A protein has these predicted regions:
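Alpha-helical recognition/docking segments in bacterial nutrient-uptake
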Residues: 1-59, 63, 123, 127
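Short beta-strand segments enriched in small/hydrophobic residues
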Residues: 7, 60, 68-75
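Hinge/beta->alpha junction and helix N-cap segments in small-molecule ligand-binding domains
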Residues: 14, 45-56, 72-119, 132-141, ...
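Conserved H-loop
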Residues: 67, 98-100, 152
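Flexible loop/turn connectors
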Residues: 122-226
Length: 226
C-alpha cells in the first residue's frame, strides 16, 4: 500500500483483514482477498466452497457403498477444517448414517503423523471402510499407513472390500494433472484457476472503482485416480 500500486491481491490475512481494508480504503486502493474459508464478511473475497467439496466427497463414498467413513487431519482451530468437517457431518446425517466423534481425528500435516494416526484409528475401529483426509499430505501419509498396516487403498465399491482395503478421499488445490498417481478420490479446487479469477477481479476493481465488493465461491470438482 505504500508502493503506489493500483490494486492488491491478499492471500490469507486471517485476523487482519479488517485492518487491511481500512488502510486500503484510506488510500483508495482496491483489495481482493484469496481466502481458504469464509471469515471476511465485509471484504471482496474469492474462496473455495469447503462445505460443498466435503459433501461431494462424502456422498461419492456413500454411493460406492461405504457407511463407516472416518475423517483424518487438520486442527480444530482451522476454519477451513471446520467447514469441511461440517459438510462431511451434514452428508452423513442426510443419508441417515451414524456420526462418531472418535472417528474425526486431528493430525498435523505430516506424512509420518498421518501414517501413525490412520494405523491407530483402524486398530481401534477395524470396520471403517473409508477415510476422508484433510489435504494431500495427510492422504499420502494415510496411504503409507495403510501399507504398513497390511491394507490397501482402492476406489472400488465396498463390495470389493474384504477387510483389507480402505478407500481414501482427500482435498487438493492443484489440477488433475498434478495429483499423485494413487488410488484416491479427490475434491480439487485448482489454485491456478482461482488465480486467473482473482486477476480478473482485481482488474475489474481497478478499472471501475464503483464496483461493489462481493464474495465469489469456487466449487470443487471430483477426480478419481485408479
Amino acid at each position: 500500500l505504500t508502493q503506489g500500486v493500483d490494486g492488491v491481491i491478499v492471500a490469507g490475512a486471517s485476523g487482519v483483514g479488517s485492518e487491511l481494508c481500512e488502510r486500503a480504503a484510506e488510500k483508495g486502493v482496491p483489495l481482493v482477498f484469496a481466502s481458504r474459508a469464509s471469515y471476511l464478511d465485509e471484504a471482496d473475497t474469492l474462496r473455495p466452497d469447503n462445505m460443498q467439496a466435503a459433501q461431494m466427497l462424502t456422498e461419492h463414498l456413500i454411493r460406492r457403498g461405504h457407511q463407516r467413513i472416518a475423517w483424518l487431519g487438520g486442527k480444530s482451530s482451522s476454519l477451513t477444517r471446520a467447514e469441511r468437517v461440517g459438510g462431511y457431518c451434514a452428508t452423513l446425517i442426510k443419508y441417515g448414517l451414524p456420526f462418531h466423534s472418535e472417528w474425526v481425528v486431528e493430525c498435523e500435516s505430516s506424512q509420518k503423523k498421518a501414517a501413525e494416526a490412520i494405523g491407530a484409528l483402524l486398530r481401534s475401529n477395524p470396520t471403517i471402510s473409508a477415510v476422508i483426509c484433510y489435504n494431500d499430505v495427510i492422504a499420502m501419509g494415510a496411504w503409507f499407513g495403510l501399507i504398513r498396516a497390511g491394507r490397501q487403498s482402492g476406489e472400488g465399491g465396498v463390495e470389493t472390500f474384504f477387510g483389507h482395503q480402505v478407500a481414501l478421499g482427500a482435498f487438493a488445490d492443484v489440477g488433475e494433472n498434478a495429483l499423485d498417481d494413487l488410488p484416491i478420490v479427490w475434491a480439487t479446487t485448482p489454485a491456478r484457476e482461482m488465480g486467473y479469477t482473482l486477476a480478473d477481479r482485481i482488474m475489474q476493481r481497478i478499472d471501475n472503482t464503483d464496483v461493489q465488493s462481493g464474495h465469489q465461491i469456487v466449487a470443487a470438482r471430483l477426480v478419481t485416480v485408479k
